[in-house]
Amino acid sequence: DYAEEIQVVKEIPYGEIEGFPVSTVPGHAGKFIFGYLDEIPVVCMKGRVHYYEGYPITDVVLPTRLMKLLGAQILFLTNAAGGVNTSFHAGDLMLIKDHISVFAPNPLIGQNIEELGVRFPDMSSVYDEELQELIKKTAKEQHIFLQEGIYAQLTGPSFESPAEIRM
């Protein structure tokens, strides 16, 4: 568990933040963890809300926007996902090289907040190449098998249909 590596300074349960969305998914602790990793200040979300829980997209992206406004410069995401690539196996780790957004609605819909970014962001370089190289190098040094692939973002909570698998 990545959060276990953090030297914790403060934990704030989402339920203690007025108006903040709280996950209904079992296993999602639902709290921010503020602290340090190797003397680097970090904020970690232990659990999150999902669009399929019935939250509006503005609530789903609220935590990410909040972290940006708090000064976060790098967003490192992890999740469990189904896969359609037959060369992948359950439990494989995958570095996302690009994505296909089959997600509706787009999380950028709504009022644009200039402090968070431009109205129409360039999506050609969403995934930082230097950070990806560092992740690949570290995985190799640690003897961690790391797949690379394209992430297809769907709303859930259903598994992929046969047509989606063939895409």
For each of these PLM feature ranges, what is it?
Residues D1-M123:
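Metabolite-binding pocket within alpha/beta catalytic cores that recognizes anionic/polar moieties
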Residues H28, V126-K136, T155-E160:
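A general structural motif
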Residues V60-V61, Q132, P162-I165:
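Short, well-ordered alpha-helical scaffold segments within catalytic/effector domains
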Residues L66, G83, E130, L134-E141, ...:
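Alpha-helical scaffold segments in soluble metabolic enzymes
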Residues V118-D122, V126, G149-G156:
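Glycine/Thr-rich beta-alpha phosphate-binding loop at enzyme active sites
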Residues K137-M167:
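Active-site/ligand-binding-proximal alpha/beta "capping" segment
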